[in-house]
Amino acid sequence: MPKFFRLRYSLRECAGDLAGGLIAALIALPYGLALASMMGLPPVLGLVTSIATAPITALLGRNPVLIGGTASATVPFIAKAVHSQGIGGAAKVCMAASVFMMVFCVLRLGRHIQKVPQTVVTGFSCGIGAMMFLSQLGVMLGVKAHVDRTSNNMLYQSWQILSHVSQAQMSALIISAVVIAAAFLSAHFFPKAPAPLVGVAASVTIAVIFGLHQREVGKLPLEIPQFAGFAWHPADVWNVIPEAFGLAFVSSVNILITSRVVEHFRGRHRHLKRADADAELGAFGIANLFAGMLAAPMSAGIPARSLASVRSGGTTRMSNLFHAGFIFAFVALGASCISHIPIPALAGVTAYIGICLLEWSTWRRLPKMRRVDALAFLSTAIAVLVVNAILAVAVGCSFYVARYCYERLSNPVASEDGMGKMAVGAR
């Protein structure tokens, strides 16, 4: 078990973790509710996922600042289960997927994520950043255009929004722009200040002073549901195994890649140990088993929350616990001050984190990179936007596999270290 309680926990660390947990909880509110609705589940279950799983992943997980929650990558699997088997059936699929994740941990499959080249990880980070920014275009512009959410092509969805740019509302654009500008200024002049929170506070102040009215978070008169009731039958095992395995695989890759992105974003060049990746899957497997008992969807790594927490000063496991505590308070107590935050302000926070993820240093080095590294970086970033994150990683890795096969066929002696280079990639 990782060291959870430390002899020294300074007030500065506590303040940073509180700020990081708060901004992560604010980001979780609209997206948790929306994703659960897309799955066909009661919206509150999207928040229950974070409340139920965060304490377990904070205690057992190896990445102290990795924050999980309801993820878009799990939507197709759970939505299909809800449609065919109901909420109880979806709970069975999630619980079976949790068992698969624990099996992956026991088989030590998580450590193989270290074989993904660093250029693929940076391309994944860049693609996720662009996706985070583009996904907020409609909210930041105040455009209420119909967008085909069934398509994974984020570029196509963005084009649908921009084709209705004439309907843009200046108030929404100003609120989101103030968040982004204030966050960047705060990060530049006051590096230790929680930049996303500064941006939200600035946007709320501007909205009140100038009377900029936009849709707000609103009150959350929601109740925590009881444990899900369902019965297992022998035939159910064969019905849930295919979907559960797919859900477990997608969630596992998401968690491990997100963990590497977060470590890279923190500026830590020393990778986590190989065993840490296995333990991370075990921690999320145990946590998701408990979430499944509540009929809540699976928890996976969320880059937006994790990186927003880091940007706000979160450095320890307590930021994850505070994130869950704030969500529980919002749901159970209905914090009135949170209800008045404009939705475009939260969209601005997500867009700000997305801009930070765009790997500007890698873009500057791109002309000097090896051809295979440049192709892997660009293809991964683009594939995240037009296909999905999991296939994007496969596309990026395929260039190194092709290079290894070519070297093995053309020069068998020189190919001895080919696979080693695949695991390192470009620095």
Where are these regions (language model features)?
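Membrane-embedded helical hairpins/re-entrant loop segments and their flanking transmembrane helices
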Residues: 6-23, 27-64, 234-318
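Generic signature of intrinsically disordered, low-complexity, basic-rich segments
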Residues: 32, 68, 419-422
